[in-house]
């Protein structure tokens, strides 16, 4: 027995599942007064008839659909009712109840109704501000939503702005939570109190980037064992003393000025000051000789996590007045926006006065740090 039948089920009415209001009607600004209704699949149905009548009961749309949705146009704003009739292969029909349908009055926005097309991600800021022109559609009581273009037809896929207001020039100002957006394109829509979309077809292209110049201060403490090649002629009890292991506890402060930051990649230059006690003996006996290091360096960070830089240190090293430079590889893991764990590998080339000797020092280190933002 067919599921859809006028013979076995006289006056049968299909039990259409309740449609989400957001899926019910879309009013598009691209084609004025165009809307779309959709419904769930009816088992056994091969085609559907869509009837729409106005407030006076006159049929204004009588169309056949082979899919579970139907788009229509040229309807004036107002109240309507629609009915879906399902047909099986024997052309037996069963109809849904008449359902209310409202077409909202909307106004066409100007071309490029949203400016700017690229917005800035401000560190620590609460929201982005999007400016729509004066012709942008918004009426009191509506909800404003920003839809990712790849999820434009998914109910609940939108970002709800914090507020909507007008500036003194008469433009609409829409504040959007800065944590909710990712790089991509979005469509701004107004949703009426009856949950009907009044779509504003201005596309907002979002490229998240931080302020081009900003300052921060890194303060970190950690542990750094030092592996230092010595002169080949030096021996202890006839055994070559090629490596000595030193264990200073380092205090490191870093001040950096970021020249460019986009998509979490950084090119920066800064000033670094270090003070650590330098153990020279194999038995890790401190000799009380402190080394002070000051340096000016360029560095690049990729993704805010991996860093590689070449340092240009200057100052005095008390033990032998050596000159040196080194390359440092750094990986940082930020637990929060400020607290991080840093793993660092440093390769230092030391040149003694008058070039009387050259040595290479490797220093892995592990430290915790805190970043102070401006």
UniProtKB/Swiss-Prot annotation:
Sequence ranges assigned to domain Fibronectin type-III in this UniProt record: 22-102
InterPro entries (alphabetical): FN3_dom (IPR003961), FN3_sf (IPR036116), Ig-like_fold (IPR013783)
SUPFAM superfamilies: Fibronectin type III (SSF49265)
Secretion signal, residue range per the UniProt entry: 1-21
Key words, A-Z: Signal
Domain of life per record: Bacteria
Stated name of the protein: Uncharacterized protein TP_0483
Species per Swiss-Prot/TrEMBL record: Treponema pallidum (strain Nichols)
